[in-house]
């Protein structure tokens, strides 16, 4: 057997995930299939690439060597694809996003902003996957979020702009919750609640929540990890969990949204693109489309409109 690009991608994904099970999920294959593939790869490389332990896998010395070469090869292949695409004037622009409120409005606005260039959109549940695919040339542009002080590392050849510098996360809970009648919530009042997070919270969100809750005197129970929007809403409406939520989120039957006193958890929204695939003018148009999509949702909740009006520093900066 000879090593192929898919083998190098599998090795990189295992290193990123830290476990075979999680890497298999991200690759869309079964764990036994990935384990068998790794054994074949190790037979070619001449030794174990990962040391297996109780808490996952870590690259061996040989693994670090193979990973360094694999990332270089994959980067060069990504650059080749991006440069070739840039030469093809009619190539569609590939946009990758995580589940953000502005997404629905962004889709319509990108078609208007980039009239004459087809735009394809894919939704991912992981910021890590978005960034990796952007660096690999599988996306030309990505829209993602960061929480509190966490900064997502970006690959070479990528430029990023901040669409929204700051937004205060609020709480979505059942309309029958004991605190649903309150106008504002203190985080300490939510000790003992069951919290829901996304499957891939690699934007700093869980760390920010745990830190904020620790300051409020408790450790949150991050029990539910669900990426399907409707299922999340159904569980919250049933009183099974509460969740951090963007303040621009629209109303959902059976639930209410309440701001947190002191805004202990804040987020920001960013747009990043491959310079070799996206001309500066198109990047500017995409940025403005993302800003417009966000602003269209500011009035979804009265409490956020009041906060927005009182915090001009949180507004997008347009050149």
Question: Predicted regions span which residues?
Answer:
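Hydrophobic hinge/microswitch elements
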Residues: 127-130, 135-138, 145, 199-256, ...
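A short LG(V/I)-centered, amphipathic sequence patch enriched
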Residues: 39-59
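Short helix-boundary/capping micro-motifs
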Residues: 12-30
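Flexible hinge/capping segments at coil-to-helix
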Residues: 159-169, 173-195
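Secondary-structure junction motif
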Residues: 102-106, 183, 193-216, 280-283, ...
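Beta-alpha-beta core module
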Residues: 153-161, 167, 230-278
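C-terminal effector-binding regulatory domain of bacterial HTH transcription factors
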Residues: 1, 248-254, 262-319
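N-terminal winged-helix
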Residues: 31-32, 72, 79-135, 143-147, ...
């Amino acid at each position: 057997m000879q090593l192929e690009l898919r083998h190098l991608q599998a090795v990189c994904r295992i290193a990123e995930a830290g476990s075979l099970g999680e890497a298999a999920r991200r690759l869309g294959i079964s764990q036994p299939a990935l384990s068998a593939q790794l054994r074949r790869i190790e037979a070619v490389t001449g030794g174990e690439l990962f040391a297996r332990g109780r808490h996952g896998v870590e690259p061996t010395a040989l693994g670090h060597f193979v990973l360094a070469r694999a990332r270089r090869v994959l980067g060069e292949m990504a650059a080749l694809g991006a440069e070739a695409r840039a030469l093809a004037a009619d190539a569609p622009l590939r946009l990758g996003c995580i589940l953000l409120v502005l997404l629905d409005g962004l889709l319509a606005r990108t078609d208007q902003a980039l009239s004459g260039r087809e735009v394809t959109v894919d939704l991912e549940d992981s910021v890590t996957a978005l960034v990796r695919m952007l660096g690999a040339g599988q996306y030309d542009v990505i829209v993602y979020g960061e929480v509190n002080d966490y900064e997502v590392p970006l690959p070479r050849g990528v430029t990023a702009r901040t669409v929204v510098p700051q937004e205060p996360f609020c709480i979505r809970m059942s309309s029958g919750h004991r605190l649903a009648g309150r106008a504002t919530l203190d985080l300490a009042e939510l000790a003992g609640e069951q919290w829901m997070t996304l499957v891939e919270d690699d934007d700093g969100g869980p760390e920010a929540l745990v830190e904020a809750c620790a300051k409020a005197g408790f450790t949150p129970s991050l029990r539910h990890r669900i990426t399907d929007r409707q299922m999340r809403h159904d569980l919250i409406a049933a009183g099974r969990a509460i969740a951090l939520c963007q303040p621009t989120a629209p109303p959902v039957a059976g639930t209410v949204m309440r701001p947190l006193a002191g805004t202990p958890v804040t987020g920001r929204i960013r747009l990043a693109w491959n310079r070799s695939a996206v001309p500066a003018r198109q990047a500017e148009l995409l940025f403005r489309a993302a800003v417009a999509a966000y602003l269209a949702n500011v009035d979804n909740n009265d409490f956020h409109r009041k906060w927005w009006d009182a915090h001009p520093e949180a507004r997008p900066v347009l050149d």
